[in-house]
């Protein structure tokens, strides 16, 4: 189990993290979300032992995670960290990069393992391609495969799908998180993408200016966001009479005392997002069809 207890960290007298606590068990995934600069990447670096905590403790299975003041070589054999900058070998092949941490004493097993990982990250056909010729998204997939090559006990992911296009992102998510769950690998992931969180995270931590705003099940936080910052993470929202409503919770109806003036209709594929003015406030709601601009509509609110 990963235990993070009251961890704080300062940089140049700026409080980057303050009293952060969390627990992650084997096979579980903790998703850390928040605005840029909220401390997500810093927390991952502290967990990895890349920096020293100012106070608090980080422990994995009763083993303290020490920073560079107490440990000369950064990192641990049981933990892998995939940062936003990929530390790959550009002049070697995809297979050589993925297998770089695997033993050469068992070449048959190594070859089989590399091919398994190539399939997990969907890079079939690129095994012999040098990394320097890959796209950013393909390099990110190589970095992910290399990180899980030796089946770590815990993996740290910093925006793991940020460079990957939508054509591959959905299936790659499914493959990777299924692999982590099957092999009981704990995961701590920093992300800006709600799709990383809702379907795959067991816990969700919201950081704001270095402090934990909330930690809970993703479904619980989504159902009751409590704060505009949290609601905004999940999509368009509106504040009506002091309450937060997602766009799908505001519904067009025939008659209602709640009336708004339509400003724009944005095509979203299987629905239109309608921007409207309600008592001088801007609100957003979903509708199957576009609505005429400047028309007055009646709305109802649904939870």
Where are these regions (language model features)?
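Conserved ABC transporter NBD signature motif
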Residues: 56-67
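ABC ATPase NBD coupling module
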Residues: 65-80, 104
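Conserved ABC ATPase "signature" region
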Residues: 109-126, 178, 184
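Conserved ABC ATPase "signature" C-loop
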Residues: 209-210
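A short, proline-enriched helix->beta-strand linker immediately N-terminal to the Walker B motif
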Residues: 149-153
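Conserved ABC ATPase signature
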Residues: 130-134, 138-140
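Helix-to-loop junction immediately C-terminal to a conserved catalytic motif
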Residues: 48
């Amino acid at each position: 189990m990963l235990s993070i207890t009251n961890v704080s960290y300062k940089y140049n007298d700026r409080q980057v993290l303050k009293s952060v606590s969390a627990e992650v068990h084997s096979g579980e995934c903790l998703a850390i979300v928040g605005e840029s600069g909220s401390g997500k990447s810093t927390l991952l670096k502290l967990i990895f032992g890349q920096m020293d905590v100012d106070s608090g403790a980080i422990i994995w299975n009763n083993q303290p995670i020490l920073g560079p003041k107490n440990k000369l070589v950064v990192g641990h054999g049981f933990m892998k960290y995939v940062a936003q900058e990929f530390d790959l070998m550009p002049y070697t092949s995809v297979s050589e990069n993925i297998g770089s941490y695997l033993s050469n004493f068992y070449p048959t097993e190594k070859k089989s393992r590399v091919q398994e990982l190539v399939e997990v990250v969907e890079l079939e056909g690129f095994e012999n391609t040098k990394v320097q010729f890959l796209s950013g998204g393909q390099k990110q997939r190589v970095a992910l495969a290399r990180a899980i090559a030796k089946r770590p006990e815990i993996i740290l992911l910093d925006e793991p799908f940020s460079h990957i296009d939508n054509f591959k992102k959905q299936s790659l998510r499914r493959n990777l998180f299924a692999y982590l769950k099957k092999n009981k690998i704990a995961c701590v992931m920093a992300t800006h993408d709600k799709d990383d969180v809702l379907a795959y995270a067991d816990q969700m931590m919201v950081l704001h200016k270095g402090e934990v705003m909330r930690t809970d099940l993703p479904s619980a936080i989504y159902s009751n966001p409590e704060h505009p910052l949290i609601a905004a993470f999940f999509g368009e929202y509106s504040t009506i009479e002091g309450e937060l409503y997602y766009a799908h919770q505001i519904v067009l109806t025939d008659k209602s005392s709640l009336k708004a003036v339509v400003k724009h209709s944005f095509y979203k594929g299987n629905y239109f997002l309608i921007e409207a003015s309600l008592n001088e406030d801007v609100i957003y709601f979903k509708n199957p069809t576009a609505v005429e601009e400047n028309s007055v509509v009646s709305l109802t609110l649904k939870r």
